[in-house]
């Protein structure tokens, strides 16, 4: 299965008639493996800051998580595994695998829990595959 198929079929899938606003799979080096057409144009330093927070949990808390120039307030996550952010009625979930970051961005009516489930389910699957 191509990386784009993982984004299209597993991340941008429909849940209760709704889906993520945007999604992507990005390598730890910041290279895009696959992304939805709606995924924001990001800066390398934004990905570097996210990677740093996985290595040093809490480093994003004072500044927030930035992606595509949008600032998300960092909320509870799983140290070294998942970062979650909130902005207004939407937010972001980032799951780290051994080689990539899985991104899901949502807005209402999708809930934070639905976004977490979509992103973390794929991330857990990829981890089991050694990716």
Swiss-Prot record:
Gene Ontology CC annotation, any one: cytoskeleton
Record keywords, A-Z: Actin-binding, Allergen, Cytoplasm, Cytoskeleton, Disulfide bond, Phosphoprotein
Motif range (Involved in PIP2 interaction): 81-97
Disulfide bonds: 13-115
Chain segments annotated as coiled-coil in the UniProt record: none
MF GO annotations: actin monomer binding
Family named by the database record: Belongs to the profilin family.
Protein name (record): Profilin-5
């Amino acid at each position: 299965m191509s990386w784009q198929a993982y984004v299209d079929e597993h991340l941008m899938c429909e849940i209760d008639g709704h889906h993520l606003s945007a999604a992507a799979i990005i390598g730890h080096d910041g290279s895009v493996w696959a992304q939805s057409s709606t995924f924001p144009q990001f800066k390398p330093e934004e990905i570097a800051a996210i990677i740093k927070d996985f290595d040093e949990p809490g480093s994003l808390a004072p500044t927030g998580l930035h992606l595509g120039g949008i600032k998300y307030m960092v909320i509870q996550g799983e140290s070294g595994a998942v970062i979650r952010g909130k902005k207004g009625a939407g937010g972001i979930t980032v799951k780290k695998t051994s080689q990539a970051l899985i991104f899901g961005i949502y807005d209402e009516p999708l809930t934070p829990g639905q976004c977490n489930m979509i992103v973390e389910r794929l991330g857990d699957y990829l981890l089991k595959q050694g990716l």
